[in-house]
Amino acid sequence: LVPATGFYEWRASKDGKTPFFIHPKDIELYSFAGIWSTWKNEDGQEIKTYSIMTTEPNSEMKAIHNRMPVILHPEDEASWIEPSNDNPESLEKLLFPLEDDSLEIYEVSRAVNNPINNDKYLILAA
C-alpha cells in the first residue's frame, strides 16, 4: 500500500505541460496499489524499490492522461497486502479505475515542476 492524500498529473498541450492536483472527493487519506522488490546491484548493495500500479483512466482522467494510478477502496486494502494470497485473478480484479465523478481535479501552479519547491501552496488551485 502506498498512502496518499493526492497526486499530480500533467496534461500535454501546445503550450507545454499543465500540472493538475487530483484526489478522491470523499477520502482524505487513501492507498495506491503498490508493488515492491528488493534486489542487489553489481556491487552487492541491496536496493529497495517500489512502483504504483496504473490502469486505464476513468472519464475524468481521460482529459488529462491515458492512465491513472490504481486507488484501492479501503475494504480492498487487506486483500491487496495479504501475503498468503497467491491467486493473481483475485488481485487483478482490484486493478480498475476509480468510479467516474469521484475525483476532484484542478490546475495548480507550475511551481510544482521544480523539485526544490516543497510547500502546501503547491496543491492550491492556480
Residue ranges and their predicted role:
Residues L1-A126:
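Short linear sequence motif anchored by a di-proline
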